[in-house]
Protein backbone atom coordinates (compact mmCIF):
# COMPACT_ATOMS: atom_id res chain seq x y z
CA UNK A 1 0.00 0.00 0.00
CA UNK A 2 2.82 2.39 0.93
CA UNK A 3 4.58 1.63 -2.34
CA UNK A 4 1.39 2.31 -4.27
CA UNK A 5 0.81 5.62 -2.45
CA UNK A 6 4.40 6.70 -3.10
CA UNK A 7 4.04 5.88 -6.79
CA UNK A 8 0.84 7.91 -7.06
CA UNK A 9 2.47 10.85 -5.28
CA UNK A 10 5.37 10.78 -7.74
CA UNK A 11 2.91 10.76 -10.64
CA UNK A 12 0.89 13.64 -9.19
CA UNK A 13 4.03 15.77 -8.81
CA UNK A 14 4.56 15.64 -12.57
CA UNK A 15 1.10 17.00 -13.31
CA UNK A 16 0.10 20.64 -12.87
CA UNK A 17 -3.54 20.33 -11.83
CA UNK A 18 -4.20 24.02 -12.51
CA UNK A 19 -2.98 23.85 -16.09
CA UNK A 20 -4.95 23.08 -19.22
CA UNK A 21 -2.60 21.03 -21.39
CA UNK A 22 -2.76 20.94 -25.19
CA UNK A 23 -4.11 17.53 -26.18
CA UNK A 24 -0.82 16.25 -27.60
CA UNK A 25 1.10 17.32 -24.47
CA UNK A 26 -1.55 15.82 -22.20
CA UNK A 27 -1.37 12.48 -23.98
CA UNK A 28 2.42 12.44 -23.84
CA UNK A 29 2.25 13.11 -20.10
CA UNK A 30 -0.34 10.38 -19.52
CA UNK A 31 1.88 7.92 -21.39
CA UNK A 32 4.93 9.03 -19.37
CA UNK A 33 3.27 8.37 -16.01
CA UNK A 34 1.69 5.06 -17.07
CA UNK A 35 4.38 2.93 -15.46
CA UNK A 36 2.34 0.00 -14.17
CA UNK A 37 3.42 -3.53 -15.06
CA UNK A 38 0.49 -3.92 -17.45
CA UNK A 39 -0.69 -1.99 -20.49
CA UNK A 40 -2.86 0.62 -18.83
CA UNK A 41 -5.98 1.88 -20.53
CA UNK A 42 -6.23 5.56 -21.45
CA UNK A 43 -9.54 6.98 -20.30
CA UNK A 44 -11.29 10.26 -20.97
CA UNK A 45 -13.97 12.17 -19.09
CA UNK A 46 -15.88 14.91 -20.89
CA UNK A 47 -18.30 17.22 -19.07
CA UNK A 48 -21.22 18.22 -21.27
CA UNK A 49 -23.45 21.26 -21.01
CA UNK A 50 -26.70 19.34 -20.86
CA UNK A 51 -29.60 19.18 -18.43
CA UNK A 52 -29.80 15.49 -17.63
CA UNK A 53 -33.23 15.99 -16.02
CA UNK A 54 -34.71 16.60 -19.47
CA UNK A 55 -35.54 13.56 -21.59
CA UNK A 56 -34.66 15.42 -24.79
CA UNK A 57 -31.10 16.01 -23.61
CA UNK A 58 -29.95 12.41 -23.38
CA UNK A 59 -26.59 12.00 -25.11
CA UNK A 60 -25.95 8.44 -26.24
CA UNK A 61 -24.35 6.83 -29.26
CA UNK A 62 -21.47 4.84 -30.67
CA UNK A 63 -18.33 5.60 -32.65
CA UNK A 64 -15.64 3.49 -34.31
CA UNK A 65 -12.25 4.59 -33.02
CA UNK A 66 -9.87 4.77 -36.01
CA UNK A 67 -6.97 3.32 -34.03
CA UNK A 68 -9.09 0.72 -32.23
CA UNK A 69 -9.34 0.12 -28.50
CA UNK A 70 -6.48 -2.30 -27.98
CA UNK A 71 -8.98 -4.81 -26.66
CA UNK A 72 -10.23 -8.05 -28.19
CA UNK A 73 -14.03 -7.94 -28.12
CA UNK A 74 -16.15 -11.08 -28.04
CA UNK A 75 -19.36 -10.41 -29.95
CA UNK A 76 -22.61 -12.32 -29.55
CA UNK A 77 -25.42 -11.98 -32.09
CA UNK A 78 -29.04 -12.90 -31.50
CA UNK A 79 -30.29 -13.90 -34.94
CA UNK A 80 -31.49 -16.81 -37.02
CA UNK A 81 -31.53 -17.90 -40.66
CA UNK A 82 -29.75 -15.64 -43.14
CA UNK A 83 -28.96 -13.03 -40.47
CA UNK A 84 -27.22 -15.66 -38.37
CA UNK A 85 -25.07 -16.66 -41.34
CA UNK A 86 -24.24 -13.02 -42.10
CA UNK A 87 -23.14 -12.53 -38.49
CA UNK A 88 -20.92 -15.60 -38.55
CA UNK A 89 -19.37 -14.59 -41.86
CA UNK A 90 -18.64 -11.12 -40.41
CA UNK A 91 -16.70 -12.64 -37.51
CA UNK A 92 -19.20 -12.95 -34.66
CA UNK A 93 -17.95 -15.19 -31.85
CA UNK A 94 -21.35 -16.50 -30.75
CA UNK A 95 -24.57 -16.66 -32.79
CA UNK A 96 -27.93 -18.04 -31.75
CA UNK A 97 -31.42 -17.20 -30.59
CA UNK A 98 -33.41 -19.38 -28.18
CA UNK A 99 -30.29 -21.40 -27.35
CA UNK A 100 -28.24 -18.26 -26.73
CA UNK A 101 -31.04 -16.79 -24.63
CA UNK A 102 -31.05 -19.93 -22.47
CA UNK A 103 -27.30 -19.55 -21.92
CA UNK A 104 -27.83 -15.98 -20.76
CA UNK A 105 -30.62 -17.05 -18.40
CA UNK A 106 -28.20 -19.61 -16.96
CA UNK A 107 -25.74 -16.75 -16.39
CA UNK A 108 -23.38 -18.13 -19.03
CA UNK A 109 -22.38 -14.79 -20.51
CA UNK A 110 -19.19 -15.24 -22.48
CA UNK A 111 -19.27 -12.06 -24.55
CA UNK A 112 -18.48 -8.35 -24.27
CA UNK A 113 -21.09 -7.01 -26.69
CA UNK A 114 -24.50 -8.21 -27.84
CA UNK A 115 -26.11 -7.44 -31.19
CA UNK A 116 -29.64 -8.40 -32.22
CA UNK A 117 -31.66 -8.46 -35.42
CA UNK A 118 -35.02 -6.68 -34.96
CA UNK A 119 -37.05 -9.89 -35.25
CA UNK A 120 -35.04 -11.48 -32.44
CA UNK A 121 -36.05 -8.82 -29.92
CA UNK A 122 -39.15 -10.84 -28.99
CA UNK A 123 -36.67 -13.22 -27.33
CA UNK A 124 -33.97 -10.74 -26.33
CA UNK A 125 -36.54 -8.47 -24.68
CA UNK A 126 -36.99 -11.13 -22.00
CA UNK A 127 -33.33 -10.79 -21.03
CA UNK A 128 -33.39 -7.14 -20.03
CA UNK A 129 -33.01 -7.74 -16.30
CA UNK A 130 -29.89 -9.80 -16.94
CA UNK A 131 -28.23 -7.93 -19.80
CA UNK A 132 -29.31 -4.41 -18.82
CA UNK A 133 -27.34 -4.06 -15.56
CA UNK A 134 -24.26 -5.39 -17.37
CA UNK A 135 -24.56 -2.82 -20.14
CA UNK A 136 -25.07 -5.59 -22.69
CA UNK A 137 -28.69 -5.07 -23.72
CA UNK A 138 -28.93 -4.43 -27.50
CA UNK A 139 -30.29 -0.98 -28.30
CA UNK A 140 -31.14 0.63 -31.67
CA UNK A 141 -29.79 3.99 -30.42
CA UNK A 142 -26.24 2.62 -30.46
CA UNK A 143 -26.69 0.41 -33.51
CA UNK A 144 -26.82 -2.93 -31.72
CA UNK A 145 -30.38 -3.66 -32.83
CA UNK A 146 -30.12 -3.65 -36.59
CA UNK A 147 -30.96 -5.45 -39.82
CA UNK A 148 -27.34 -5.02 -40.90
CA UNK A 149 -25.85 -7.38 -38.33
CA UNK A 150 -22.74 -7.89 -40.47
CA UNK A 151 -21.75 -4.22 -40.32
CA UNK A 152 -22.50 -4.09 -36.61
CA UNK A 153 -20.18 -7.04 -35.99
CA UNK A 154 -17.43 -5.57 -38.16
CA UNK A 155 -17.70 -2.20 -36.39
CA UNK A 156 -17.47 -3.87 -32.98
CA UNK A 157 -14.39 -5.82 -34.04
CA UNK A 158 -12.85 -2.66 -35.56
CA UNK A 159 -12.92 -0.77 -32.27
CA UNK A 160 -16.37 0.69 -31.84
CA UNK A 161 -17.19 2.08 -28.41
CA UNK A 162 -20.48 3.20 -26.94
CA UNK A 163 -20.89 6.45 -25.02
CA UNK A 164 -23.56 7.82 -22.75
CA UNK A 165 -23.67 10.83 -20.46
CA UNK A 166 -24.16 9.85 -16.82
CA UNK A 167 -26.39 11.55 -14.26
CA UNK A 168 -23.85 14.35 -13.89
CA UNK A 169 -23.69 14.96 -17.64
CA UNK A 170 -20.24 13.38 -17.95
CA UNK A 171 -19.19 10.94 -20.67
CA UNK A 172 -16.57 8.38 -19.62
CA UNK A 173 -14.80 6.32 -22.30
CA UNK A 174 -11.68 4.28 -22.84
CA UNK A 175 -9.90 5.57 -25.93
CA UNK A 176 -6.95 3.21 -26.16
CA UNK A 177 -3.94 1.89 -24.31
CA UNK A 178 -0.79 3.48 -22.93
CA UNK A 179 1.17 1.51 -25.54
CA UNK A 180 -0.59 3.44 -28.32
CA UNK A 181 1.27 6.31 -29.94
CA UNK A 182 0.23 9.87 -29.11
CA UNK A 183 -1.06 10.27 -32.67
CA UNK A 184 -3.20 7.13 -32.43
CA UNK A 185 -4.74 8.25 -29.14
CA UNK A 186 -5.31 11.74 -30.52
CA UNK A 187 -7.13 10.34 -33.56
CA UNK A 188 -9.40 8.31 -31.30
CA UNK A 189 -10.23 11.30 -29.11
CA UNK A 190 -10.98 13.51 -32.10
CA UNK A 191 -13.33 10.82 -33.45
CA UNK A 192 -15.12 10.65 -30.10
CA UNK A 193 -15.44 14.44 -29.84
CA UNK A 194 -16.81 14.57 -33.38
CA UNK A 195 -19.42 11.93 -32.48
CA UNK A 196 -20.37 13.85 -29.35
CA UNK A 197 -20.80 17.05 -31.35
CA UNK A 198 -23.08 15.23 -33.78
CA UNK A 199 -25.09 13.94 -30.80
CA UNK A 200 -25.60 17.40 -29.29
CA UNK A 201 -29.25 17.84 -28.28
CA UNK A 202 -31.00 20.65 -30.15
CA UNK A 203 -32.25 22.01 -26.83
CA UNK A 204 -28.80 22.19 -25.22
CA UNK A 205 -27.91 25.81 -24.46
CA UNK A 206 -24.58 27.51 -23.85
CA UNK A 207 -21.22 25.74 -23.95
CA UNK A 208 -21.65 22.08 -24.89
CA UNK A 209 -18.17 20.62 -24.33
CA UNK A 210 -17.26 22.14 -20.99
CA UNK A 211 -14.34 20.20 -19.55
CA UNK A 212 -12.09 17.35 -20.60
CA UNK A 213 -9.57 15.26 -18.69
CA UNK A 214 -7.59 12.15 -19.55
CA UNK A 215 -5.81 9.61 -17.39
CA UNK A 216 -4.36 6.12 -17.45
CA UNK A 217 -5.71 3.29 -15.29
CA UNK A 218 -3.28 3.95 -12.44
CA UNK A 219 -2.49 7.58 -13.20
CA UNK A 220 -3.81 10.97 -12.13
CA UNK A 221 -6.10 13.05 -14.31
CA UNK A 222 -4.65 15.57 -16.77
CA UNK A 223 -6.90 18.49 -17.73
CA UNK A 224 -7.06 19.19 -21.45
CA UNK A 225 -7.42 22.47 -23.32
CA UNK A 226 -10.03 21.21 -25.76
CA UNK A 227 -10.64 24.52 -27.53
CA UNK A 228 -8.73 23.38 -30.60
CA UNK A 229 -10.61 20.12 -31.06
CA UNK A 230 -14.24 21.04 -30.41
CA UNK A 231 -15.19 21.53 -34.04
From Swiss-Prot:
Keywords: Repressor, Ribonucleoprotein, Ribosomal protein, RNA-binding, rRNA-binding, Translation regulation, tRNA-binding
Cellular component GO terms held in the UniProt record: cytosolic large ribosomal subunit
UniProt keyword annotation of RNA-binding present: yes
Keyword rRNA-binding: yes
Stored PROSITE patterns: RIBOSOMAL_L1
Biological processes per GO annotation: regulation of translation; translation
InterPro entries per record: Ribosom_uL1_bac-type (IPR005878), Ribosomal_uL1 (IPR002143), Ribosomal_uL1-like (IPR023674), Ribosomal_uL1/biogenesis (IPR028364), Ribosomal_uL1_3-a/b-sand (IPR016095), Ribosomal_uL1_CS (IPR023673)
MF term (GO), any: rRNA binding
Similarity comment text for this entry: Belongs to the universal ribosomal protein uL1 family.
PANTHER family found in the cross-reference section: 54S RIBOSOMAL PROTEIN L1, MITOCHONDRIAL (PTHR36427), LARGE RIBOSOMAL SUBUNIT PROTEIN UL1M (PTHR36427:SF3)
Protein task: Binds directly to 23S rRNA. The L1 stalk is quite mobile in the ribosome, and is involved in E site tRNA release. Protein L1 is also a translational repressor protein, it controls the translation of the L11 operon by binding to its mRNA.
Subunit structure, interactors included: Part of the 50S ribosomal subunit.
Name of this chain's protein: Large ribosomal subunit protein uL1
Organism: Nitrosomonas eutropha (strain DSM 101675 / C91 / Nm57)
This protein's encoding gene: rplA
Amino acid sequence: MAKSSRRYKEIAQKIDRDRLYPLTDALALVKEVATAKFDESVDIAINLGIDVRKSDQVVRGAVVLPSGTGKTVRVAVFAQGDKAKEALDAGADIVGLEDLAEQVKANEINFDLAIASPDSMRIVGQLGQILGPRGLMPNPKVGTVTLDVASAVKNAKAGQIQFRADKAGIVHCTVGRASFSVDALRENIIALVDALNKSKPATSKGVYLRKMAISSTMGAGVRVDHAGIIN
